[in-house]
Amino acid sequence: MKKFIAQMAMAALLATPVLSIAQESQPSLPYREVSAQAEDSHKVVVFFSFACPVCASYDQTFSRWAKTLPPGWSAEFLPVAVPDKGNYIAARAFFAVQDADPSRLAAFMSAAYTLIQQNGMTMEDPGTWSRAVAMADVQGFNEAWHNVTQQRLERAFAKLLTYGVDATPSMVISGKYVITPDDVSGDSALYMNLANGMISKVMQER
């Protein structure tokens, strides 16, 4: 599984005491429990990277699964906005599409994965994103791109640190439980069953 937190990210984590730092749960459990974040209590936050081949393999699965969540729940896809050029450009492009033409976001993500994972394009290359936008027929991208603020990217990075995410993909269930495919030895069907089970667990706890 792709590990992506660089030394800079870990240094930021250690130097930021105001953030809720993930606390390890029992090693035998297929999830990690962290300090609960109330704003995400009815969400599944999906952390991903376009550079991650495992994320690419889950792209369509996540998209379909997000539509099956219980009433009152939502899925939030969040790119790993680690402060390096490639990840920042990728995150900015994602947010721009999300703002400009949200109905085309899933198509944009699939196009970006294809260009990066299959065609060998890079996240640092602006041409990757202009091509993905064209493939997905996104409208209004350029204006939205200029309106994505540095603060928004920093908030995405802060959430990454809050949940102690160190692998992609990772799902955070109800702002409390973090799960990755590694927790189920990479079994994709079991991973999605685990996600459903964690949502059921949360609903029973309320």
Where are each of the predicted segments found?
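Extracytoplasmic thiol/disulfide redox context detector
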Residues: K2-K85, T149-Q151, F157, L161-T162, ...
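Short N-terminal signal/transit or membrane-insertion segments
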Residues: Q23-R32, F94-T114
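Extracytoplasmic/secreted proteins, especially bacterial periplasmic and envelope-associated proteins
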Residues: V46, S57, T61-R64, Y88-R92, ...
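Second-shell loop/turn segments in exported
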Residues: S49-A51, P79-D84, Q98-D99, T114-G120, ...
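Sec/Tat-exported extracytoplasmic proteins
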Residues: A51, A66-L69, V97-D101, A112, ...
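Soluble non-cytosolic domains of exported or imported proteins
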Residues: P53-A56, D84-Y88, D99-S103, M123, ...
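Structural microenvironment flanking redox-active thiols in thiol-disulfide oxidoreductases
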Residues: P71-F94, L105-A132
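C-terminal cap of thioredoxin/glutaredoxin-like
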Residues: M135-R206
